[in-house]
Amino acid sequence: MQTGMTRACLSAAFAGVLAAVLAGGVLAQAADPQVGTWKLNLAKSTYSPGPAPESATTKIEIAGAGTKIIVDQPQADGSTRHWEVTANYDGKDYPVTGNNPDADMVARTRINATTIQSVYKKGGKVTTTQTSVVSADGKTRTVTTTGVNGAGQTVNNVAVYDKQ
């Protein structure tokens, strides 16, 4: 009889610990300040070499241990860049799909609670590095991009996004 009670107690304790761990993971993901819909604030952004996109919207949502990112950037020539990536924050390469001329893979790493670093590659070669920082109030996301774009031009962009 005591063995049955011991098993029941251990099972209940294990279930409680498992529930706490899972809830903690969900809460941590829900609190990720990168998650949300972000609209480019052109007045606060700088693009070198340019031209800047006409506008840009980035949607970031939780996906497993990382995020799914959906980017739409209408361009001055009337075209739209649309690309997506689902990646964990583990520094491993994940495919970039859509029409991003500068990348076909990305590796993402969480630096701290508000900062993500993304290393973009094209054909196995690093093209650009992005650092995405969310402000303390959670209303602004600043993305600094450095490197060389698909056209071989040196890139030094600071894109400021407002949370929608």
Segments predicted by a language model, with ranges:
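N-terminal secretory signal peptides that target proteins for export/translocation
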Residues: 1-10
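Compositionally biased, disordered extreme N-termini, encompassing classical targeting presequences
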Residues: 5, 21-31
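Bacterial N-terminal signal peptides
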Residues: 11-25
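Hydrophobic small-molecule pocket/channel-lining residues, especially in calycin-type beta-barrels
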Residues: 27-164
